[in-house]
Amino acid sequence: MARVCQVTGKRPMSGHNVSHANNKTKRRFLPNLQSRRFWLESENRWIRLRLTNAALRTVDKNGIDSVVADMRARGERV
């Protein structure tokens, strides 16, 4: 399964580990993905989303129905 947030679309990004001697080696910054179940009152069912902690805060702020509506408008299947 891809390490991609279903709500925000955040993906792993690349960068460097930098030592004290300023040597650089490649590394990946992974998104803080969480798997959560949400109750959709309008459809009377549970949905499971794989989202980042930032997206979880968006769900808390805007509500799951609004977030799911935005996802469906983008063409994502929920």
UniProtKB/Swiss-Prot annotation:
> InterPro entries annotated for this entry?
Ribosomal_bL28, Ribosomal_bL28/bL31-like_sf, Ribosomal_bL28_bact-type, Ribosomal_bL28_sf
A single GO CC term, please?
Answer: cytosolic large ribosomal subunit
* UniProt-listed Pfam families: Ribosomal_L28
The domain of life is: Bacteria
* GO MF terms, alphabetically ordered: structural constituent of ribosome
What are the alphabetically sorted keywords of the record?
A: Ribonucleoprotein, Ribosomal protein
Q: For the region Disordered, give the residue spans.
A: 1-26
What Gene Ontology terms for biological process does this UniProt record contain?
A: translation
Q: Which SUPFAM superfamilies match?
A: L28p-like
Q: Which family is this protein grouped under? A: Belongs to the bacterial ribosomal protein bL28 family.
Protein's name according to its UniProt entry = Large ribosomal subunit protein bL28
UniProt organism field: Nitrosomonas europaea (strain ATCC 19718 / CIP 103999 / KCTC 2705 / NBRC 14298)
Q: Which gene encodes it?
A: rpmB
